[in-house]
Design a protein with these regions (language model features):
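Domain-level signal for soluble alpha/beta catalytic cores
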Residues: 1-173
Length: 173
């Protein structure tokens, strides 16, 4: 919801700002991670909702990027970039140099298989902000984030994962 302009417009009368809320949640997350073992890899997935192939919010990462990407004590981010609701890759400029980014470029909401070359071009665009050796590829979210799951067959889900693997091998070797 932090990225959703409509959500924040609806909260205009509240006495809280996006910046205050983002800073509060960042502090809470970092406090929760304070005593984690040093060798534990901790990541954050920024989700826009994933219920039966629908979504709950939209908007690019720009509103939260300066808070989250530069300051959260995690090793990597799993970010949704499967459609126009996710915005562009420009907010990746805020990701600190010690973190990795997993690009969720393959949607888990639709059975339609993405075009490999389109995904590879999008990876190249993201690499303008994060070096390729710190980028990874995955589906945008889980295939069954809730009991009912998304509107894909098991075969279609495996095809999406095979596509991710094929692209990763071609891009990263």
């Amino acid at each position: 919801m932090f990225c959703d302009k409509n959500y924040w417009e609806a909260r205009q009368n509240d006495s809280v700002s996006l910046e205050e809320e983002a800073e509060k949640y960042l502090r809470l997350n970092n406090l929760a991670l304070e005593n984690a073992p040093e060798d534990l890899v901790i990541t954050t997935h920024v989700c826009r909702g994933n219920y039966h192939s629908t979504w709950a919010s939209s908007g690019g990462y720009e509103p939260i990027a300066p808070f989250l990407f530069a300051n959260e004590n995690v090793s990597a981010y799993y970010l949704e970039f499967d459609d126009e609701r996710s915005g562009g890759f420009e907010p990746l400029r805020f990701v600190s140099h010690d973190k990795k980014v997993v690009l969720g470029l393959v949607t888990s909401k639709s059975p339609i298989l993405e075009e490999k070359e389109v995904i590879k071009k999008r990876i190249a665009k993201a690499a303008k902000y994060i070096p390729l050796n710190r980028l990874y590829l995955s589906p945008q979210c889980g295939f069954a984030s809730c009991e009912i799951g998304n509107k894909l067959t098991e075969e279609e889900q495996w095809a999406k994962l095979a596509l991710v693997k094929e692209i990763a091998q071609e891009v990263w070797g």
